[in-house]
Amino acid sequence: MAKLPDKTITSALNLQRRLLEGIDAAKAAESAIFEQSGETDATATVLDQLQNSAERLREPYSRLYTLLLRIAEAQPASSAMLDLLYRSIEQGQAALDASAASVQEAKRDWNIL
């Protein structure tokens, strides 16, 4: 593996874990709202939003996994690859923040604890 700082590796792996937790939270809220109210005109929008939130987190999760693996296999990793990793961490965090806000709003609106 190209020698990445431990802080970068830890940051990427922690973000992957939080992205996975975010996917789980979005799908759990979607399931709870569906079980509580079914799929109606009133719930259709929020169910779609929660599904989209989970989907938006899959991309950065997969990208981080792929980049870390490619960097480990590349000897040495290119600076472009490393830059892509750093940008992916930033973008993944932004996606996670946006998704968390959407999930919290849906849970609040539909009284899901």
Where are the model-predicted features located?
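Amphipathic, heptad-repeat alpha-helices with coiled-coil/zipper character that mediate oligomerization
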Residues: 14-28, 48-69, 95-98
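Leucine-rich amphipathic alpha-helices with coiled-coil/heptad-repeat character
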Residues: 33, 61-64, 68-71, 75, ...
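Residue-identity detector for glutamine
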Residues: 16, 36, 49-51, 75, ...
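Amphipathic alpha-helical binding modules
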Residues: 78-113
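Short, charged/polar, low-complexity loop and linker segments
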Residues: 1-6, 30-45, 72-83
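N-terminal leader/targeting helix
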Residues: 1-20
